[in-house]
Amino acid sequence: MQKYNIWEIRKKISSAYLAEDIVKEFNLDSNMAHILKSKELGTLADIKEFLYAGYESLLDSFLFSDIKRALNRIDAALKNNEVIYIYGDYDADGIMGTCILYKILSSVSSNVHALLPNRFKQGYGLSCDMIDKLKAADTSLIITVDNGITAVKEIDYASKLGIDVIITDHHECNEELPQAYSILNPKKPNEPYPFKDLCGAAIAFKLALAMIEQKIASYDICELITLAMIGTIADIVPLTGENRIIALIGLNEIKKTKNLALIELMDDANLNPHEITCADIGFKIAPRINAAGRMTDANETIRMFCSNDRSFVKSKVSVLSEINKFRQTEEKKIYAQAAQIVEHENPDSRYIWVLSNPSWHEGVIGISAGRLAEEYNRPFILISESDNICKGSARSISGFNIFNAIKNSEHLLERFGGHSAAAGFSINKKNISEFERRLNEYAYENGISKLLYNTKYYDYESSDGIFTQKFISDIELLSPFGYKNP
């Protein structure tokens, strides 16, 4: 297909300083100063915070409106030796967030447990069947990680059984919120927490920090922020604001990590901890962590991250590496089959592509959908077909909210969830055709046409000679580089 690439210079925000002020204040290369002018940094103090961020730059966890209520319930549960279950998600973000809360809470009580649903048996999020099992284990408090914000029915059911639920989630909210004991989600309506793009692991980390501050529990925050960093990079949230701070600190802390799982994962990927980058986490570490949840069961990955038995950890890393190789093979197969259909039918014939196949592995379709969306610059939805209820995964393009598009057809779905860039859902096979029709109608009515020109932005134009040793050294201060911080 024809590529529609348009390059535009990023708009400079109004600021009370000149590039010359930046050069003088921070002893930076003049070209670097002009690049900083394109960032959303209104004052020289903002620039200082951006360039030299540390733990003190993290936002106050107590800005979450519901966090005191969550802390009080957790404190009471620990003091009363109640059974607590941390119920996470099976992707790298959910696994890291679950590990964070399990590590800190289990350091206080032996009645703390971690559980991830099986993608193929229970599917995403809380279910009434799982709540029954937790009730049978005398659970009185569930803390969700990276899920729960749409589990209205399930949390009502838990409440009737006498189980309190604290939700930590970053996905988009529906009109009706669950009647949970406490909800920590920056996207919650009227939520005052100022940074809205935290991932699930980062929210779990913020809750852990608040526990430490309130002396409810204590733990090495260097290890916890390293796990939050992995979740942040793996979930491809914008590397701006607090996310960039978490990634920056975590990439520094991983250099001296004592976590055996991280040490063995880096060794398996042939990575030097002292030279590890955001790309290494995103393309080498995160896929290995994701592999179990995509292809089998991720609960052993939790055990691996919490174990001090090197032989056990080494064996689990080896298994993950093999599973990841199988995942790569499946992903390439799905991509090739889908791309062949698209090319045969003309890539421009749809605003949103919806493709289904009974042989497509439901744990891998999201990755393939992301590659296709990037290649053809339009949203892609891939569905793993079955005789009745099918599983789908959606990936979007910049500027088009796929969550809202899917929500517009929620009456055709069994369940769904996600955010502006990605979503997952279950759908009856008989509804797929109508679902595709409505999605494309919605896309047309909401102006997707103007987004199909793949606009790429750059920060600065300069003459030859920009790449001095000083400039190359200074540019590293903008790292870590990733989504929304190229």
Locate the predicted segments by residue.
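Short gly/pro/ser/thr-enriched loop/turn and capping motifs at secondary-structure boundaries
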Residues: 120-122, 151, 171-176, 190-192, ...
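Hydrophobic, well-structured modules enriched for small/aliphatic residues and gly/pro motifs
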Residues: 91, 148-151, 158, 165-173
